[in-house]
Amino acid sequence: MSATDNALSRLRGAVHNQVRDFLRTPLIQAPMAGVATPQLAQAAMAAGAIGSLGVGGTSAEKIATLLDRQRELGAPSAHLNFFVHPRAQAARERELRWLEQLTPLFDELGVPAPTELSAPYPTFDDNPQLLELLLDQAVPLVSFHFGLPANAAIKALGRRGTTIMASATNPHEAQTLAAAGVDIIVAQGWEAGGHRSHFDTQPDTQLSTTKLVELLVRQCDCPIIAAGGISGPDDVQTMLALGASGVQVGTAFIPCPESAASPSHRIALADAVPVTQMTASFSGRPARALVNRYVQLLDPVVAQAPNYPITYAAHRALMAAVQQAAASQDPAAATHGDLAALWAGTGAGKSPVMPAAELVGWLMQ
């Protein structure tokens, strides 16, 4: 058997029957909150991959609407990804200092800066409606970022037959996930775009995807999914040859016509040499994004940023100000596409732009 066939066999053996029914290739389209859509997930699943929706920070009501849309498209239920970050701790003085850093940008837009901040959404365990939704709708595949929810939630999902995935950035985190009964571990390398899943109490060791996969394949009995910097067929085959049971690809799917990526995001990815950087300046947690003016201005003072996701509230207010200025046809707003959080991994700009189903085929050739 080829490395691809071996990987597919291992992955199919670990997932819910509803996923196994359509899974023909060991590839996961990454969740990517704000970018992944039911249409993108449906296209990936139609091509035999696992389609995903990032719903961290999304209400149960909105998630139910997304699942209804999946059904309207005639698609199986997508893999849903949730955030399980520590409960945000307010720090009024710190929040005010951060708002002072952003005030010049609000002034450019002619919109007052907020005078206070609060967490824009709760963590998974603080929103019991999320677990109720997953159990009621029997979602077949769920993943968690920034760690795991309470053990009671893991057990309840297991009794319902849900396949559980979670991300690890080092061997100790993987050990924690395996001990909790996680079915599949996503090995998130340093190259990955978007939020870093690191939840260990020790400093981040910044392991590359290749090194992390090598370590986890030897350590773990469950399937390991490689994630980070995977932008072409050679990258895919390298990871499968190392023993990964699949790959998770995100950045390559952002320019797909089925995604919800903004025009500025698509244009930035089309740059001749897109540059990415790990920064906590958008949300308060490290996340890899395309370098733009916001990163250049705020990353040098990121030590002052409030806790995640309170910092996110400040950036959301800034982007609302951009939209407000644009709605009023303020010429200043036209120059502020460089303030957005344009998530991307180190493989940015290295994949062809094509519909999602075609991209799955190209990656797995």
What name fits each language-model region?
Residues 2-219:
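Active-site entrance/lid segments in N-terminal catalytic domains of soluble metabolic enzymes
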Residues 195-225, 230-365:
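Conserved active-site-proximal phosphate/metal-binding subdomains
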